Amino acid sequence: MELPDADLKTDTAGKRQHFQKDFFYRLVRLKKRKIMGKYQKLIFTILTGQADNKIKFIDLCNLLKKLGFEERVRGSHHIFRKEGIIEKINLQKDGSHAKPYQVKQVRNLIIKYKLMEKI
């Protein structure tokens, strides 16, 4: 599997964000040894950005809850908020999967607020 450049990530505004190179490569080493937990694998998949359309909706919701977000449901909209984070995350199902653009929004938040260190 080809990995993206671990030094820089680009958010939707085109600004470069440095993210934790050590954490990313630690995940790569754990994956090679096959000793990653469920949420570490999910974060690895989200950060690589190669399977945004294959992330299960329920797995993404559970990951956000594990990261400390509070969920509020209004119809088909699942809204996640966390103290200290300005943005709110709004997720909807696309069948049994999360919508790819919403997975990208979650990835940008994980990188921006360094939430990957919480797992």
Regions found by a protein language model. Give the residues of each.
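Basic nucleic-acid-binding interfaces
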Residues: 3-6, 12-74, 83-119
